[in-house]
Amino acid sequence: GIDTPELKQTCLKEGAKVSCGVTAKKILIDKIGNNNVKCISEGKDQYKRTLAECFVNNESLSSYLVRSGYGFAYRRYSKKFIPDEDYAKTNKIGMWSMDFDYPWDYRRAL
């Protein structure tokens, strides 16, 4: 699975605050556009929430967000999105071009 920044989460780019959570939402909305989204259920988590991977035009939205630098591979649950994260990190794409807290660290600090 993946994790994404919280809507209120900000990052720092060259000393300026950037709304990285809002940007993550925007690039996902832009990617989906008016296309149909197909989700494949992968079961439930410990809190009984549905886990699913969603696709638009046969492209994984999870992979897209991670490769765009606005999603992070949940390494303890899956290795699937690590190559996408490595690509974004190596190329300093999205949040990897900024100073940021991982979403799980951001939530813990709230």
Predicted regions: what is each one?
Residues 1-70:
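Electropositive
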Residues 72-76:
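Short, polar/flexible loop-turn hinges at active-site or ligand-entry regions and domain interfaces
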Residues 77-110:
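N-terminal targeting pre-sequences for secretion and organelle import
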